Amino acid sequence: MADAPSGPSVLSHYPGAGLAGEQQREEERHKGCHHHQLNGLISPDLRHLKAVSSLKNKLLEQKTRKDSGLVQPQGRTDTRAPNGLERLQGEEEKLSACLASCSLRGDGEALGNHVSQGENDDTIRYVRYESELQMADIMRLITRDLSEPYSIYTYRYFIHNWPQLCFLAMVGEECVGAIVCKLDMHKKMFRRGYIAMLAVDSKYRRKGIGTHLVKKAIYAMVEGDCDEVVLETEITNKSALKLYENLGFVRDKRLFRYYLNGVDALRLKLWLR
């Protein structure tokens, strides 16, 4: 088995490949979020996400009350207070304005695709996964520096079930970065996003590609009503730890001998609510 590279481009690993990965995930008991309040430590680029989530929840609650007839309109006078429908419309406008000002998307930028300028005039495009034709590029990029290979079924499990949470960084026709995630219910209590794989080509590191991919994935998770985002990464992977902690992730748990190469993992977590 190959040793883990000293400077891996893979910044997070799918835990199912580790010796104790799945077992530790099942045995883990959920810890209350009050033990890890962010207290403003979340990255300024992502801080608005908590406000968006809160506003979105409030909007959904008001819509549910309106649909069930619990919100009664006020009398129609010039000095009347806004009725339920008007308040709902006001919240929708506020949410739209908040989303429009989101730092993850520039003016006119779609969630799936956008372009940024890298060093040496390399134009970096960020695109959402669209077809099976992109699978080979993702596998090549992620497998290149992995100490333990994944089967194609592992990639398909994530990408086919959550294609909206897979993004690629492209320079011309070359894939230079990729992120693969999922979003589902955790213990029937809340919606948890999971970053399974993140990789950046060694020639294109230190250009913010990894950070950009993580931001796009997190924003897509927020649109799917995500409550928290978690991932595991090797405890020796200093560049990955720095990237995630700069975005507001905190160290939640140490997993001993988590990977097949015997290296410990750190579970990182970001609360969005």
From Swiss-Prot:
<protein>
    <recommendedName>
        <fullName>N-alpha-acetyltransferase 30</fullName>
        <ecNumber>2.3.1.256</ecNumber>
    </recommendedName>
</protein>
<keyword id="KW-0539">Nucleus</keyword>
<dbReference type="GO" id="GO:0005634">
    <property type="term" value="C:nucleus"/>
</dbReference>
<dbReference type="InterPro" id="IPR000182">
    <property type="entry name" value="GNAT_dom"/>
</dbReference>
<dbReference type="GO" id="GO:0004596">
    <property type="term" value="F:protein-N-terminal amino-acid acetyltransferase activity"/>
</dbReference>
<feature type="region of interest" description="Disordered">
    <location>
        <begin position="1"/>
        <end position="39"/>
    </location>
</feature>
<comment type="function">
    <text>Catalytic subunit of the N-terminal acetyltransferase C (NatC) complex. Catalyzes acetylation of the N-terminal methionine residues of peptides beginning with Met-Leu-Ala and Met-Leu-Gly. N-terminal acetylation protects proteins from ubiquitination and degradation by the N-end rule pathway.</text>
</comment>
<keyword id="KW-0808">Transferase</keyword>
<feature type="domain" description="N-acetyltransferase">
    <location>
        <begin position="125"/>
        <end position="273"/>
    </location>
</feature>
<dbReference type="Pfam" id="PF00583">
    <property type="entry name" value="Acetyltransf_1"/>
</dbReference>
<comment type="subunit">
    <text>Component of the N-terminal acetyltransferase C (NatC) complex.</text>
</comment>
<dbReference type="InterPro" id="IPR016181">
    <property type="entry name" value="Acyl_CoA_acyltransferase"/>
</dbReference>
<dbReference type="GO" id="GO:0120518">
    <property type="term" value="F:protein N-terminal-methionine acetyltransferase activity"/>
</dbReference>
<dbReference type="GO" id="GO:0005737">
    <property type="term" value="C:cytoplasm"/>
</dbReference>
<dbReference type="GO" id="GO:0050821">
    <property type="term" value="P:protein stabilization"/>
</dbReference>
<keyword id="KW-0012">Acyltransferase</keyword>
<keyword id="KW-0963">Cytoplasm</keyword>
<comment type="similarity">
    <text>Belongs to the acetyltransferase family. MAK3 subfamily.</text>
</comment>
<feature type="region of interest" description="Disordered">
    <location>
        <begin position="62"/>
        <end position="85"/>
    </location>
</feature>
<dbReference type="InterPro" id="IPR044542">
    <property type="entry name" value="NAA30-like"/>
</dbReference>
<dbReference type="GO" id="GO:0031417">
    <property type="term" value="C:NatC complex"/>
</dbReference>
